[in-house]
Amino acid sequence: MSIKSFLARKWAQYIRKKIDLWAKDPIPTQEKILSSLIQKAKNTVFGKDHHFDQIHSYEDFVKQVPIRDYEALSPYIERVKEAQTDILWPGKPLYFAKTSGTTSGAKYIPLTKESMPYHIQAARDAIMCYIAQTGKADFVNGKMIFLQGSPILEKKNGILLGRLSGISAHYVPKYLQRNRMPSWETNCIEDWETKIDAIVKETIKEDMTVISGIPPWVQMYFERLQEKSHKPIGELFPHFQLFIYGGVNYEPYRQKFEHLIGRKVDSIELYPASEGFFAYQDSQNEKGMLLLLNSGIFYEFVEADTFFSENPKRISLKDVQIGVNYVLIVSTNAGLWGYNMGDTVMFTSLSPYRIVVTGRIKHFISAFGEHVIAKEVEEALAQAVSKAGGEVSEFTVAPQVNPASGELPYHEWFIEFEKLPEDMETFANTLDQGLQAQNSYYKDLIEGKILQRLKITCVPKSTFVEYMKSQGKFGGQNKVQHLSNDRKIADNLKW
């Protein structure tokens, strides 16, 4: 055992104990966070507009601060972008994290001196929890790669602007900098394909032990490595131990990854966003990610089924239930208030509070009232691959409302297979049965002869890569939308 790995184990045990302190005292921790946020922001423009000085309880907060999405909050954000002070949070932000927006245009999310450290701390703590639980720390002696956006930042009215992953690159702890890859120069390459090729060249002969990124882009990295080396990734990097990911559900990609690697590796799921680092997987045995309750973020929840009603009920952490699909609402020490993340989550545990991300409130299929969500299609696909074989590179699902020749409507699955199932009919049946098991409304529509069984359209290799290029969303933190309530994506796939 090296000194480095020995110290990592000791440090991990210390960090885990600190985490357990607030995890075991969740409701008071959240109440203190809300009180602190209100107190610090009461003299801001937003605080005065919403009478923060009159807020003394969660009920007061709900009355004074409505739920807003980015567009509704943008009048305040525009003033922050103009370098006005004390608008949403005291002073001015350190950065704007620019995001293309999952369901809308470009967003400028403020990052403050209070919020930024938590983004870095959470990523570190996720790794520490892994070490504390498993005792595995030898990976700290090898090289680590984080596939991320360019760290080159621009200035807008004196405030630095960039992608969150690029901003985070400026905060890599000194003790990781020697082990971290790729080089700064390579990380600054904007064109994703050029960047991947440069990363492959830099890393192919290194002792890579930790690899991190969004699964579809890490998959591309692995494929390029394999093209060059003609070896499984696990043989090329014999000490590769840990895959860290976020942004999309890993399960649809898992079988393909294990084939590329040639063996199983441990993984840690993260839930980072420009708006905050909300959760991470703290256990290799328990389902879900630990909700971060002591990171300057106050959480609220609205049942997804009621979210678009006239007056949806907001609840705080103490009233959530396991197995209910909630829209995530946050108020943060970066000046977001009653902010609709657009994400939906479900609790898998209440002691401690653990969640899984189930999708986006605007990403669903409900052309016939079925309200199928991302979690359901992803789990059904993972089960179909497990039972009927095949390897999936990427996919998306769209409704076919008006099929030709008078047949019943159906869900159309566009799947890019790396390896076809032996029997496509069996695969399609298994997939449809899996989706029916996930969603009773869909099952009722099938049994009631309103819908026919789903249909699979196999698309050639690189179809989704070409689609993402055509949309200007190739590489980095962008990901393919796995389902939609119209055929905009489906009709733009070219092959």
Name each region found by the language model:
Residues 110, 115-122, 243-244, 267, ...:
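Long, hydrophobic, well-ordered secondary-structure blocks that form the structural core
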Residues 130-174:
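Conserved AMP-binding loop of ANL adenylate-forming enzymes
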Residues 105-110, 363-367:
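Short small-residue beta-strand/loop micro-motif enriched in glycine and branched aliphatics
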Residues 123-124, 129-137, 142-144, 179-182, ...:
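Extended alpha-helical, oligomerization-prone segments that build pores/tubes and scaffolds
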